[in-house]
Amino acid sequence: MRARLSLLALLLIVGTAHAAYERARTNEREHMVEEQLISRDITDEATLAAMRTVPRHRFVPEDVRRSAYDDNPLPIGHGQTISQPYIVAYMTQAARLKRDSRVLEIGTGSGYQAAVLAELCDEVYSIEIVEPLAHQAAATLKETGYERVHLRIGDGYNGWPEAAPFDAILVTAGAEDVPPKLFEQLKEGGRLVIPVGPAHSTQFLKLVTKRNGKPHLHTLMPVRFVPFTREKP
């Protein structure tokens, strides 16, 4: 009897500690939204709600988890990073997503951006070329309730033609140009958000809109992303 009571007491302590930990992370997310996003012109309510909801700390390695809600990119292994919260929100807002939008992400990474997109629309496709990252992202997405994200391992330069056309495509790695196959897979009126420029240097986040089958480019801001990785021939 005493052993059972001791076990119940231990479970209660663990459960209380976990609840307190998650409340603290919720408070950190709210602070992140207020101080990093709203104060810097992220105004789309759906985007803000998604950023308040997705547990970013679950999508970063344990050794950097205490910095999950800081205004910085963080390493996630294999030479890759998770973008700072502001950039995730900015790119999401620029895509102008609706609940019935079909969106493609190039560069799954940890799965965080895909989870944010899944808060906004029902059809999310994501491609990751680094196999261990893809497996980890799939596991984290499932653990956090975003298992409906369609994930593929492969070269994102070629897009996902079987699932095309897309209302929006977000690229989370710096490309030296706009991949033609990604533009082809946009719907008429679709929006492609992509960092363009040389590797390991300043790039520019571009918004490419498809109008009458032709690309219309608009430069959004200077950025710096990890290079767009291609499959080796």
From Swiss-Prot:
It catalyses: [protein]-L-isoaspartate + S-adenosyl-L-methionine = [protein]-L-isoaspartate alpha-methyl ester + S-adenosyl-L-homocysteine. Its main location: cytoplasm. It holds the Pfam family PCMT. The active site is at 83. It is found in: Cytoplasm. It is an enzyme of class 2 (transferase). It comes from the Bacteria. GO terms for cellular component: cytoplasm. GO terms for molecular function: protein-L-isoaspartate (D-aspartate) O-methyltransferase activity. Transmembrane segments: none annotated. InterPro entries: PCMT, SAM-dependent_MTases_sf. One of its GO terms (biological process) is protein repair. Belongs to the methyltransferase superfamily. L-isoaspartyl/D-aspartyl protein methyltransferase family. HAMAP family: PIMT. Catalyzes the methyl esterification of L-isoaspartyl residues in peptides and proteins that result from spontaneous decomposition of normal L-aspartyl and L-asparaginyl residues. It plays a role in the repair and/or degradation of damaged proteins. This is Protein-L-isoaspartate O-methyltransferase. It comes from Opitutus terrae (strain DSM 11246 / JCM 15787 / PB90-1).
